[in-house]
């Protein structure tokens, strides 16, 4: 694999020499940093099993190497990487996999270790969505996830990835993560804080990642991280699990932050060792039981993961002074909900008791039941999935609902050819050789729902959202 030149400040190298265990080679560290990062993907088990995915992609000649800490994760090598970006494959467009760095699969593995099965989870710094979508898959779309993102520009990307993967149990918020301890005290069974950091571990992906690095900057970042972990710990219920992670390598932003929390709440913080998380985890194990992953250990990004348990309640923070405002939705009455459910089933959309119908004007939404306790405590950017808009003739079903709720065994499902599917993703109407009988058609490709279409004569009218329309070369190889 080709080398690339990474910029290393001298002070950073000095710091790494001091931080690295004697069992590891510093020369190996430098060599690993100069190698480009291996590509990796995670199969979205909400859409397809790992076995079925491997069978589906077998003809492509992809070399898929299992990632030890994630059963559905694989390092991927392809002969035609330049010819077709992974993001333009049919399997990616339909949400069958997520392009995710192998190290970043570790925090969610830690969150669900030892049979942990939380019902209400918070992802404090969620964009672009790799870990939120991984959490949702582990929860099988049950329970609820509060996915927060401080950066307004990244909330849109977060929602797009959640929607593409067919996730229905997520509420999005846009806050500074430091507000949650006061706003929603002790309300979560599990919390992932993948904290903003100095990014020392990402040089294999970005050779210039350390251009603005300084020890002083690390100290400032660590101060913010302490405030974030304190807030997250307050939002965690007694008995709950907190996973703290970063993609950086210095101890000040990693071990020291966790030790600060334990010093602050000595009777309430228990470190849960991660040495048995996967075979070989002991190679990165610290004396506290954390995983400090230098890039040469597993040939991946540098990363840090700690798992903590809150053993008892702690004093509450002062109540927040902001006002959330009136919640603009109201629950749909049972009789009407039954009618809506019946109409939705007619086009192949079904849901279970984990989701409940709410209404705002002419909009119908499905919210995860386990998020309802947070209504009135935080302001949501987006909650659950938009099911439909009502109009005089019935319902206008929404694309995100189709991707999350439809199953391909519906009587009105219509399987497209590869060429027709590509036309669909380009936002064009489709003219199949044999037109379907039904007027409302559940369009599928590779037996995966990819949208709803109206049959108009011999034409299938495209309803693919404009913002998702693709151009350029796609999976059939035609531009």
Swiss-Prot record:
Organism phylogeny: Bacteria, Pseudomonadati, Pseudomonadota, Gammaproteobacteria, Enterobacterales
Record-annotated active site: 247
Gene: rsmF
GO molecular function terms listed in the Swiss-Prot or TrEMBL record: RNA binding; rRNA (cytosine-C5-)-methyltransferase activity
Catalytic activity: cytidine(1407) in 16S rRNA + S-adenosyl-L-methionine = 5-methylcytidine(1407) in 16S rRNA + S-adenosyl-L-homocysteine + H(+)
Function: Specifically methylates the cytosine at position 1407 (m5C1407) of 16S rRNA.
Primary location class: cytoplasm
Pfam families named in the record: Methyltr_RsmB-F, Methyltr_RsmF_N, Methyltranf_PUA, YebU_pre-PUA_dom
Binding site residues for S-adenosyl-L-methionine: 125-131, 149, 176, 194
EC number assigned by the record: 2.1.1.178
Name listed for the protein in its UniProt record: Ribosomal RNA small subunit methyltransferase F
GO biological process: rRNA base methylation
Top-level EC class as recorded in UniProt: transferase
